[in-house]
Each structure stands twice: as structure tokens, then as C-alpha cells.
Amino acid sequence: MPSQYDLVRREYLKQLSDYTGRNTILYYSAWLQKSLMANGTFDFGINDNDKTGFMTCIYQLDKTKGLDLILHTPGGDISATESLVVYLQSIFGKDIRVIIPQMAMSAGTMISCSAKEIIMGKHSNLGPIDPQYGMYRAHGIIEEFENIKHEHEVNPLGTQVWGPILSKYTPTLVGECQKVIDWSNGLVKQWLMNNMFNGIPDAETKADSVVENIGSHALTKSHSRHLHIDYLRNLGLNITALEDDAELQDKVLSIHHSTMITISSTKAAKIIENQNGVSFINTIG
């Protein structure tokens, strides 16, 4: 028996789908509300388990209507993200829009760059795509090794203080970090060229510029950096302002607020749901 929270949220989802004439799936994570409650026991990020949720929600949809993906996520696993994008594009082709009511960080930004169009508000943000390798930021590890190398060339005796730090790292770590950076950047470049920038004469140059700006830890300074609409538009991304259509804005934000109330007031920790009320909900607590 669906709760009142479910009924309200699903009604707003249906209203948005009816308004756009498109399939609509929301993907919401409760990482902002429940990460401390989970205490490391729940994966709030994009992972391979999400594929089952999307399969459940896509089944029996009219695939000719395209897809609007409403995304709210801290990011997640690169391999799961790649597989999800490949799956969605195999079903809906290039007719995918990503709507960002609030935040789509890291791997969520990668998914956004695979779409033909991003819809976001003045309050919305994407984030840097610089990846992690295990527990560590890949760019940070490479920068640290480069600093050690430089200091050793200038003052070989001075680098002894780095011994305890170096002892934590495996011999192949730097190479593995570079590979995961190349993987992340390569995916975003490929997706941009194949969809959002498809048919544009300077597509590769534009894609390289986007990747350089959102993929460089040296430029973004922090993996948690919030990248807003004006900055992202200046990079050349195809972004429509949510405020350009007052009715669309009202419907999207109604979905957002009702979903945030759901994950704040119930045990739901991740919700994947379509406009027909078909859902895949993970809970904790």
C-alpha cells in the first residue's frame, strides 16, 4: 500500500510527464539527509544495483517518447556510471535530457554530459569529474608524487620526510590513478561529441575544453566544488534554464520538494521511479 508521500510524489511525476509528453524517471539519493545514519553501511552513490531499478522503471515505457532523467546524486562508481549511460542510450538513443533540481555531483555530472540537453536552475549545480582511486583523489596522488619528484631534484636529502607518506602507496598507484583519470575524461569527451555536441564543427575542441575545466583538480580546487549554470554555459554545455518555463519549473520543483520530504520523513535512502508510479526504493533504518 503506497504511503501519502508516494502518492503525492507520483502525482507530480505524472503531471510533469503529461506536460512534456516525455518519459520521466527520477533518481534521488538521500546522502544529504542520511549519510551519518548509514554510518558507511549504505552506498548512496551510483552503483551497479541501480541498473535493476532502471530496468524496472523502463519496462513497458513507450521508448519513442525519449527520457527526462531527474537527477540528484553525490556521484558514484565510474564503471557503473558508464554501464548505465550505455544502457539508457541503447533504449532511448540520443533523446535524453537530464534535469537537475539541486545537485548532480561527480558521476552525476558525467551522466549529465551524456545527455542532449541539461535543464537546471539558478540554485542547481553540477560538480567536478576528477575521480577517486580507492580512498584517494587520483589527481591529488599524482600531484603529490610530482611535488616529491620536484623536491628530490632540488634537495635529495629533504625528501626523507615523505617516507611515511610514500610507504602507504603501492608501486603501481600513480599509473592506476592516471588510468582512471583518462577513463573518466575520455568517457565525458566521447559522450559530449556523440550527443550534445554532435554535428558541431568544433565538437572535439569544445569537448576537450569542457573536460579540461571540469576534470582538472588544479582548476576546480575541490571535488566538492559547486559548478553553477553561468559557469557551465560559458564552457559551451547545452543548458536550458529552469526559470525560462514557469510551469516546467513549478512541476520540477514540486517533484523535488516532495521527494526530499519523502527521504527526510521515511526510511527511503534511494528512489528510482517513473511517471507511471513504478518504483525501486532502497531503505535504511
Give residue ranges: language-model regions.
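Terminal-region recognition feature
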Residues: 1-103, 109-285
